[in-house]
């Protein structure tokens, strides 16, 4: 919802000459915020569970959700886009299935799969080392480089295009995931997680920026919702699969799944570069 609102405001109220730079910075911030949710969140949960009790983390999340979601709903920016384009023609819904948009959704889904498979396999790995409650703390190491590079993505030169950023940092993610599968100590796993974090932030920024650029006319809200849901759905599916694999086939097998997820991200990035270019519709 946040991305949808911000993209609409930028598209409706920013001068065309400033839109690209502003959108890039906005997507960088939003992706860094995602890192806080998907990576730093488990890190904080681990701290609270270890220092106080597990229920404290759940209670804290409930309070934060109530306070800040309510504040977002009532924020004055919500009125800036209401009724502004009531007569704007919407592109047919079938345009959401265009290959150049679908490939972005697949890439974002891959990131969600990576989040879920990494945290679940890491938890199994830490359990074999007798430190299952510390998995969230170790997982948080990915957020260091990820959030920082996500915010710094706005400073990348225009010559380093979004499609190439996706591919380059996706390869970094894949390389780290392959190394993660062979980690044999907690220290090694921590170092590898930090390296993998370097690939996540810029990849998400590139994907969301491409999704915004390729959104059909009048369908930006739907596009942003699909992309956001792809992360969550991917994380949920991968968590369930990785948990079952860990129980049925062992931790080593589960630790291969992040590499599979990262491979999906890279394959989608290659597909994105190979697809014929078209003029952005939104």
Q: What is each stretch, according to the model?
A:
Residues 94-140:
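Helix-loop boundary and gating motifs at the non-cytosolic
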Residues 65-77, 259-282:
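Multi-pass alpha-helical transporter architecture, strongest
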Residues 14-31, 132-136, 217-227:
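Loop-to-transmembrane helix entry/capping segments in MFS-fold secondary transporters
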Residues 218-249:
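A late C-terminal transmembrane helix in Major Facilitator Superfamily
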Residues 49, 148-162, 246:
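Helix-to-loop junctions at the C-terminal end of transmembrane segments
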Residues 1-14, 122, 202-215:
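Intracellular juxtamembrane helix-capping segments at the cytosolic ends
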Residues 73, 172-184:
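C-terminal ends and interior cores of transmembrane alpha-helices
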């Amino acid at each position: 919802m946040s991305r949808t609102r911000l993209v609409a405001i930028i598209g409706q109220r920013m001068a065309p000459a400033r839109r690209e730079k502003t959108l890039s910075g906005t997507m960088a911030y939003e992706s860094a915020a995602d890192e806080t949710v998907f990576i730093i969140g488990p890190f904080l949960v681990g701290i609270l569970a270890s220092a106080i009790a597990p229920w404290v983390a759940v209670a804290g999340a409930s309070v934060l959700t109530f306070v800040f979601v309510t504040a977002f709903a009532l924020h004055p920016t919500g009125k800036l886009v209401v009724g502004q384009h009531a007569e704007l023609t919407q592109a047919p819904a079938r345009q959401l299935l265009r290959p150049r948009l679908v490939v972005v959704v697949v890439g974002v889904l891959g990131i969600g799969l990576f989040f879920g498979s990494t945290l679940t396999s890491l938890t199994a790995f830490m359990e074999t080392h007798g430190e299952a409650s510390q998995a969230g703390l170790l997982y948080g190491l990915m957020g260091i480089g990820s959030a920082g590079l996500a915010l710094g993505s706005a400073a990348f030169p225009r010559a380093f295009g979004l499609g190439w950023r996706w591919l380059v940092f996706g390869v970094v993610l894949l390389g780290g995931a392959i190394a993660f599968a062979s980690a044999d100590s907690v220290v090694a796993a921590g170092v590898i997680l930090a390296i993998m974090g370097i690939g996540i932030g810029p990849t998400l920024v590139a994907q969301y920026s491409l999704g915004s650029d390729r959104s059909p006319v009048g369908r930006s809200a739907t596009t942003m919702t699909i992309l956001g849901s792809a992360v969550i759905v991917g994380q949920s599916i991968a968590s369930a699969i990785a948990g079952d694999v860990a129980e049925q086939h062992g931790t080593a097998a589960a630790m291969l799944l992040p590499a599979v997820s990262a491979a999906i991200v890279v394959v989608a990035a290659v597909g994105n570069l190979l697809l014929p270019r078209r003029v952005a519709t939104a």
